[in-house]
Amino acid sequence: MRYPRDLQGYGATPPDAVWPDGARIAVQFVVNYEEGGENSVLHGDAASEAFLSEIVGASAWPGKRHWNMESIYDYGARAGFWRLHRLFTERDMPVTVYGVATALQRSPAQVATP
């Protein structure tokens, strides 16, 4: 049975892309905005976030807030986002945001920022 995904792509003969100013590569910056979209009893979830975290081996806390987990997400919204925004804005660099809808809904100041 043939594997259904194309993992070869163009192979050894990629198309001859012509980029502006003789550039040899194109880079796209993508920021994931998830802060406020994580599992939390505050959001009506049965337990705290356990999966999307830098806490190794984190487990959900049923019916309780996980203060360390919330702190990680809070930092992203309160400080991390603004640091990245300044860096990209100062350099006039375009950026793509992959945002969790509920996270964006809970962060109107970040969403309204040009």
Residue spans of the language-model regions?
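Catalytic alpha-helical scaffold of carbohydrate-active enzymes acting on polysaccharides/glycoconjugates
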Residues: 1-114
